[in-house]
Amino acid sequence: MAERANLVFHNKVIDGTAIKRLISRLIDHFGMAYTSHILDQVKTLGFQQATATSISLGIDDLLTIPSKGWLVQDAEQQSWILEKHHHYGNVHAVEKLRQSIEIWYATSEYLRQEMNPNFRMTDPFNPVHMMSFSGARGNASQVHQLVGMRGLMSDPQGQMIDLPIQSNLREGLSLTEYIISCYGARKGVVDTAVRTSDAGYLTRRLVEVVQHIVVRRTDCGTIRGISVSPRNKNRMMSERIFIQTLIGRVLADDIYIGSRCVAFRNQDLGIGLVNRLITFGTQSISIRTPFTCRSTSWICRLCYGRSPTHGDLVELGEAVGIIAGQSIGEPGTQLTLRTFHTGGVFTGGTAEHVRAPYNGKIKFNEDLVHPTRTRHGHPAFLCYIDLSVIIESEDIIHSVTIPPKSFLLVQNDQYVESEQVIAEIREGTYTFHFKERVRKYIYSDSEGEMHWSTDVSHAPEFTYSNVHLLPKTSHLWILSGGSCGSSLILFSIHKDQDQMNIPFLSAERKSISSLSVNNDQTSQKFFSSDFADKKKLGISYYSELNGNLGTSHYNFIYSAIFQENSDLLAKRRRNRFLIPFQSIQEQEKEFIPHSGISVEIPINGIFRRNSIFAFFDDPRYRRKSSGILKYGALKADSIIQKEDMIEYRGVQKFKTKYEMKVDRFFFIPEEVHILPESSAIMVQNYSIIGVDTRLTLNIRSQVGGLIRVERKKKRVELKIFSGDIHFPDKTDKISRHSGILIPPGRGKTNSKESKKFKNWIYVQRITPTKKKFFVLVRPVATYEIADSINLATLFPQDLFREKDNIQLRVFNYILYGNGKPTRGIADTSIQLVRTCLVLNWDQDNKNSALEAVRAFFVEVSTKGLIRDFIRIGLVKSHISYIRKRKNSPDSGFISADHMNPFYPISPKAGILQQSLRQNRGTIRMFLNRNKESQSLLILSSSNCFRMGPFNHVKYHNVINQSIKKNTLITIKNSSGPLGTATQISNFYSFLPLLTYNQISLIKYLQLDNFKYIFQVINSYLIDENGRIFNLDPYSNVVLNPFKLNWYFLHQNYHHNYCEETSTIISLGQFFCENVCIAKKEPHLKSGQVLIVQRDSVVIRSAKPYLATPGAKVHGHYREILYEGDTLVTFIYEKSRSGDITQGLPKVEQVLEVRSIDSISLNLEKRIKGWNKCITRILGIPWGFLIGAELTIVQSRISLVNKIQKVYRSQGVQIHNRHIEIIVRQITSKVLVSEEGMSNVFLPGELIGLLRAERTGRALEEAICYRAVLLGITRASLNTQSFISEASFQETARVLAKAALRGRIDWLKGLKENVVLGGVIPAGTGFNKGLVHCSRQHTNILLEKKTKNLALFEGDMRDILFYHREFCESSISKSDFSRI
């Protein structure tokens, strides 16, 4: 009893960690055998007590946490609010995903933390509780899924599914939850199988690399070492890692404290000695590692250190290589199995929050913060430095310090309540997480037209790319609408939101019904239409009997009508308007059908002075063959053509074009073929061939002549010069000139022959060699530049307003410079001369300040016949940013940003409705083909039509009869609407004006039978200055919604609607949903304001998408998008899951040296830098030796640290020496380079570094090489044993190469002997005589080389030391002997 009283009694819970410590102490005190007996007693005790207390596990023991209900309800409420914010466009998809995942993760984690206290209070002897929290079986995550909630799951690709599983396994899963659960569990099961096989294959490759590494000697005699220091410049090494690195190593140098030696060289380090060294505060300790051993085919006992099994120095003959490979590969398999039961459940981290301790007012320095968005899309302030936040209450002042890079979630002087979150601290950068960049694609939910916000300056990455980067946070809008899917429409050239008259154009139209909508004051009728295919024909279109209001937008270019030229539409040149016509000189046969006048209008519609308005490519100046242009430039007038590529980018200058005052130019034809570099050319340079000669496998020559082959970058130019070859003598004058044109009649005269040329010729001197030359006389095509078609007469005289005084000048210019080659691609022709029309105006009059001309197209549809009009007028200034544009009343137009660009003229049942335009001025027919009718139609600001003058008698009579019948019609003369800009509010009322004009469709520039009915416009016009013009105070018009693309705001009870909202609502403005625009008003749906009437607003439905800086927008402005099209790509970073399933591929990438991160890139850069610098400093022989050595040391340390970082982040502890043995093998080769090569090695050959050094010394000449990093697979296939290589992979290839090269396998490794059935050269009793012999051999060599060793004890030692992180290495050039 007395002995029992002296025993120490420990009253504490024994968990897994405590058991480990207990077993460790028992082994230290009693030894292995006695400890095993004690542990058997503990095991028996446990079974007996479990049986005595009758612990069993039943389904009733799974108790759900009571607080789960309201926690889940609170998370659902937050998710609903988040969904609303996303719908309103306040957060984008990535922020929504992040926040949703964190909401549910926080809920799940809170439930998990509640489990333990709940069990302790309600049922402390619950079997689940005791089993899980004692560590006997099951962990907290598994119990949490049983009694808490399963939470968020991963899909097979590893992405989070933002729909959580709210049930636990006790409650049972719904069908949806079960399917999602299968996703995650499938990921766990599949990952387990796949990663287990991956880890097994990794182990096989590792063992393959190092299977021949066996402990052969006690001491290799190296003087090198690696210095380990607990304190480094960059960071502090933890004491635990420092001790782990030192224990079991052997010292490379003596350690002195002052003058006293406390440890000797070649002494192994135990825990006692290491603790003493730490206590003494030793700065750096030099230790021996496998890196410092002097051979790559074996290792010595002292460089390896203690054996991890029994704690003494490793025995001779120990196969440490295989142990190292299995030590690295095995944890991958082991840790993969750990994730099996968890089944893909998401585990992540949330940010730390700072909460207010009590109610009060916030105070902080606003100069130290910067406004930003959190990763959840909330507004916040970012702190750059430590920020002091003061919370003032009535009697207490509390100060909180917010660390840098944190988010402050409150404003200055804001009142906060107790426990309110005021700041969010980001996760510390010291934690090791695998970050990966993920692309999140956002797809369009509906069909429509793309807009981005008006205040976003937008610049594309590439000029012609449809991917654009957003510079700041903004909204993208998809304006609702549909595409017309009928293939029977005659001219499908509607673009950029043209008004389409679907009932007229659609061949599937069934009927026209009439709707009636009752309002308080009046009853209106609306037209609607039924379609067979409603999904496809939902075009944004509306129509009303009383007239409607469309506003023109200048940013839209309308295509003209084509007959046979529909293929030109495929070029997507939306700013080009082609006027097809036949030859004026009645030469239809000679003209190509695609010829015509091209009018190119910049996207913003602005022409500068002296800019090209239209051009015409004359078919007479077209060539199909390549050649060279020659002409004499007498005088050049510069015509600068400017265009705005994108309206926000300002004016971009294009290439200067020159009008050449020449009457003729010359074209020297030649056949040119541009071939890839690898083409097999079947003709020789400077050879002469005939017609239809095979040049390559697929190309034959079109003409015969002299071959010229020119090799350029990655391509070959093959030219064929036709002509006569002349070998001149010394007296021949023609031989003195090269590259000249000789006019006809001139000839060459000499003693032998005389010849005169009928046409112009081109003389070219060819010099195949330095001594020989000959002259090639080539034919020349001569072109006379005559007066071409007078393009100005094709435009009507009243195209411009009379007071603007705009003129059109005609120029001809040559498209290619003098002596420049022209190249034709495939079968396309080359245009040599272009005729252009240049806009000019007089600057001497009162409008001298005018700088630009404004031009745009208008498309009018009448009875299915589409007509194009152009309008041109001067403007005083041009500002590229639209929202800031101010226009004077006399500028000729009013631009409205983002306005509905419809110009609806909608014919239905013989009635064509006219809608007023906001643009003042004149819109007129663009081109008249028939000279008898100068202008057919003019639409002016006063809404009056001027018909005529018609020279044809029949047309003239019809108009006169119409005027007689309707005497109240106002018809102005030609000077009226052209010269006046009437006020917007001055509208004319017309009685019906009937005009009959019988013209066929074939001529397509004249009007068919139609009838105009003008009605009084009953709408408000709001211009950009906020002025409201009441067009008709007595009407109350509501437009009919068509296909649910429009929303209407009725105002029946609020009389001051326009007064209150005139400063808020403007035409073209975008509204997010739930925005209140007036008092007592319903909240609007999201969309764009199209029409503001007296008591109603027409809004086009739109869906907003928020995009943040750096997001990539796909598509162009105002492009039509279909449902499912990619809209935006977000690129964001996320943390990978924290299990070994993600860490194992990382280890594999590092060991295979194909890492996707910066390891291999940095090492490659360092390798090149060291090779260059060291070679330059020390000269070539020293440079290659030291450069390669330092690079290898550097890369070895970097790789070891990287691999250890991965394993330590997973909680796996592997001794450094195992990794060092592997890394030593993959970094011990050098690549022989080509420069200064000796005859021993081939360029590109992989050899060992030691072999390269010894060969260099033996040959007494420099061998140029550089260090390379081999992956473990390549290292396995580059060993000294071809039997080992063949047993790994690619057996046939390896054996065939070995047979051809006559390789000899000395059977030094383990695997070769296993394959051949021999005794493996390993084991503690294997062949000691061989080891003894080699030791004597080494000693002799070392005695011979003592002079070389002394070299490194002097000044050179400082150069050879290289410091990197916590390691230091010195390199010796002593002789390295090998077995």
UniProtKB/Swiss-Prot annotation:
Question: One of this protein's GO BP terms?
Answer: DNA-templated transcription
What's an example of a GO molecular-function annotation for this chain? Answer: zinc ion binding
What the entry lists under HAMAP family is as follows:
RNApol_bact_RpoC2
- Would you tell me the protein name for this molecule? DNA-directed RNA polymerase subunit beta''
Q: Which Pfam families match?
A: RNA_pol_Rpb1_4, RNA_pol_Rpb1_5
Report the source organism: Capsella bursa-pastoris (Shepherd's purse)
Q: Keywords, A to Z? A: Chloroplast, DNA-directed RNA polymerase, Metal-binding, Nucleotidyltransferase, Plastid, Transcription, Transferase, Zinc
Annotated residues that bind Zn(2+) are located at C220, C293, C300, C303
